[in-house]
UniProtKB/Swiss-Prot annotation:
It comes from Chlamydia trachomatis serovar L2 (strain ATCC VR-902B / DSM 19102 / 434/Bu). It catalyses: (S)-malate + NAD(+) = oxaloacetate + NADH + H(+). Its EC number is 1.1.1.37. The active site is at H188. The lineage of its organism: Bacteria, Pseudomonadati, Chlamydiota, Chlamydiia, Chlamydiales. SUPFAM superfamilies: LDH C-terminal domain-like, NAD(P)-binding Rossmann-fold domains. The gene is mdh. GO terms for molecular function: L-malate dehydrogenase (NAD+) activity. It is an enzyme of class 1 (oxidoreductase). The keyword Transcription regulation does not apply. GO terms for biological process: malate metabolic process; tricarboxylic acid cycle. NCBIfam families: MalateDH-SF1 (TIGR01759), PRK05442.1 (NF003916). NAD(+) binds at G12, G13, T14, G15, Q16, I17, A18, N106, Q113, V130, G131, N132. Keywords: NAD, Oxidoreductase, Tricarboxylic acid cycle. This is Malate dehydrogenase. Belongs to the LDH/MDH superfamily. MDH type 2 family.
């Protein structure tokens, strides 16, 4: 039985990530099995026919939680009174593309979306940004939507966390459930910081199971950092199904939190407990509180290796921010 209904917008509705994500959303993976969904699916003008096909498939899926499905090429209609938005629509990264190319193209897209959110969405709407460069895109959207709460903007680092989680599980030869406190700091890029020093395996420090520090620093970390490029090289397209799953999990951690769960998210750095510059979107380890709000987990130590990587990632985010004219 549906106990409440949330209004949700998904952009890039005819794209590969959205195609996978929409069915997970409709199934209840994000908001729960008792939460109805008033779903608005947006894509750019010219995609009307493809949007109608997406709607047909959702109708044919006979999802009990879908209270309404609207497809639209109007951002105003998509964002009107929403509780949550998943900003998936963007130019995907292809072989040989540089981050600066993506920043120019996708920055314009999210600026327009931010302005539309500012005029139509609920003030406390939660905004999840996916398109790359995701930290800076999220920052652009946030700054074009000053009416909305800055703390509710999230850049997706969950795919990086999942990649690291899987690699540690394989290396330790333990189930995924045995690995916890997997943390990714900083920018979602090749300069992200997969912080293995916080991880636990069977609730014990990781070094007790994976004693090979050289593997952690020089194999695992670069592998996580470059995994997106490896996927593009292998399949000729950027990650889609795994990105959709990561997005659903990222939102689930907020809407259906598990007690004690840590999750990585790119959030506003204002008043952060690590003394990092404010007015950035920076990847932090987070956890949910009983109040329904998240907090950046304070007091985690950085060893020399992690501290050095953190500075590199911070510098990249600052450089990207400096290249943007709001």
């Amino acid at each position: 039985m549906v106990s409440q209904t949330v209004s949700v917008a998904v952009t890039g509705g005819t794209g590969q990530i959205a195609y996978s994500f929409l069915f997970s959303l409709a199934h209840g993976d994000v908001f729960g099995l008792d939460c109805g969904i008033d779903l608005r699916i947006y894509d750019i003008p010219g995609t009307e026919r493809a949007l109608s096909g997406v709607r047909m498939e959702l109708d044919d899926g006979a999802f009990p939680l879908l209270q309404r499905v609207q497809v639209t090429t109007s951002l105003h209609d998509a964002f009107d009174g929403i509780d949550a938005a998943f900003l998936i629509g963007s130019v995907p990264r292809g072989p040989g593309m540089e981050r600066r190319d993506l920043l120019k193209k996708n920055g314009e897209i999210v600026a327009t979306q931010g302005k539309a959110l500012n005029t139509t969405a609920k003030r406390d709407a939660k905004i999840f940004v996916v398109g790359n460069p995701v930290n800076t895109n999220c920052w652009i959207a946030m700054n074009h939507a000053p009416r909305l709460l800055r703390k509710n903007f999230h850049a997706m680092l969950r795919l990086d966390q999942n990649r690291m989680h899987s690699m540690l599980s394989h290396r330790a030869e333990v189930p995924l459930s045995a690995v916890s406190q997997v943390v990714v700091w900083g920018n979602h890029s090749a300069k992200q910081v997969p912080d293995f020093t916080q991880a636990l395996i069977n609730d014990r420090p990781i070094a007790e199971t994976i004693a090979d520090r050289d593997w952690l620093e020089n194999i695992m970390v670069p592998s996580v950092q470059s995994r997106g490029s490896a996927v593009i090289e292998a399949r000729g397209k950027s990650s889609a199904a795994s990105a959709a799953r990561a997005l659903a999990e990222a939102a689930r951690s907020i809407y259906q939190p598990k007690e004690g769960e840590w999750f990585s998210s790119g959030v506003c750095s204002d008043h952060n407990p690590y003394g990092l510059p404010e007015d950035l979107i920076f990847g932090f380890p987070c956890r949910m509180l009983a109040t329904g709000e998240y907090e950046v987990i304070p007091g985690l130590p950085w060893d020399a290796f992690i501290r050095g990587k953190m500075q590199i990632s911070l510098d990249e985010i600052l450089q990207e921010k400096a290249s943007v004219s709001l």
